[in-house]
């Protein structure tokens, strides 16, 4: 099976609507991302429903806590059978290392463990507001390096940082990129954006795309077009 690069970000407050959308797309064409709102509303059973339909799930809960608590949450995600789970890199090396170590018993069945660097909505002024006098890109590199040194599989980063991070941290280090907008779609609330092909060419391994697919008249066709554009 080809490694699907597209991760569709589900963003629904109604489970029936979410599953109606999911039933219109093919698990061979993408993976699915479940975030905080949906997981809080619908719980682990919703993830199990997606698994029953054949989808791989990225559980996007961005855990950030003391090492013991964070690692146990990561283990719970592994027990749920998700394909990918993430933690905030700003939680530090001990937190990330504990989270990685708790997954070791799962072997090749363990989820990918990804660090979150700087949220794509954040600009330099936002970082300054929390006491960080640093450019977003510089802080991303710092946190991504810490993530790699902690033994995690990769980071979430904007497409603009992909090329730099691939060069700095190596090809095996996975880059998961939100803020992706196919040509012709609205920018939305993500500040640092790029098209799917541009992002992959820059070094992104996985592309998180939401509304351009979930709000499309024919989401399967949009997915097919994106996947086709990536094979050129």
From Swiss-Prot:
Catalysed transformations (reactions): orotidine 5'-phosphate + H(+) = UMP + CO2
Top EC group: lyase
GO biological process, any: 'de novo' UMP biosynthetic process
Pathway noted in the entry: Pyrimidine metabolism; UMP biosynthesis via de novo pathway; UMP from orotate: step 2/2
MF GO annotations: orotidine-5'-phosphate decarboxylase activity
Gene3D superfamilies: Aldolase class I
GO CC terms in record: cytosol
E.C. code: 4.1.1.23
Residues annotated to bind substrate: 11, 33, 60-69, 120, 181, 190, 210-211
Keywords: Decarboxylase, Lyase, Pyrimidine biosynthesis
Domain of life: Bacteria
Catalytic residues (UniProt): 62 (proton donor)
Family matches, as InterPro entries: Aldolase_TIM, OMPdecase, OMPdecase_AS, OMPdecase_bac, OMPdeCOase_dom, RibuloseP-bd_barrel
Disulfide-linked positions: none
Family membership noted in the UniProt record: Belongs to the OMP decarboxylase family. Type 1 subfamily.
Role this protein plays: Catalyzes the decarboxylation of orotidine 5'-monophosphate (OMP) to uridine 5'-monophosphate (UMP).
Oligomeric form and interacting partners: Homodimer.
HAMAP family: OMPdecase_type1_B
Name assigned to this protein: Orotidine 5'-phosphate decarboxylase
Organism encoding this protein: Vibrio vulnificus (strain CMCP6)
